UniProtKB/Swiss-Prot annotation:
Miscellaneous note of the record: Negative results: does not block the calcium-activated KCa3.1/KCNN4 potassium channels, Shaker IR, Kv1.1/KCNA1, and Kv2.1/KCNB1 potassium channels.
Role of this protein: High affinity blocker of Kv1.3/KCNA3 channels of human T cells. Blocks Kv1.2/KCNA2 with an order of magnitude smaller than for Kv1.3/KCNA3.
Protein name, UniProt field: Potassium channel toxin alpha-KTx 6.12
Tissue expression per record: Expressed by the venom gland.
The organism of origin for this protein: Anuroctonus phaiodactylus
Amino acid sequence: QKECTGPQHCTNFCRKNKCTHGKCMNRKCKCFNCK
């Protein structure tokens, strides 16, 4: 998977968690919609 850069969002499963450096704060979360 590509590392996220810029605005990021987490999957609906962990919507409350924010993405940081291509990884969500919760390991179960995955980043998407990365630009």
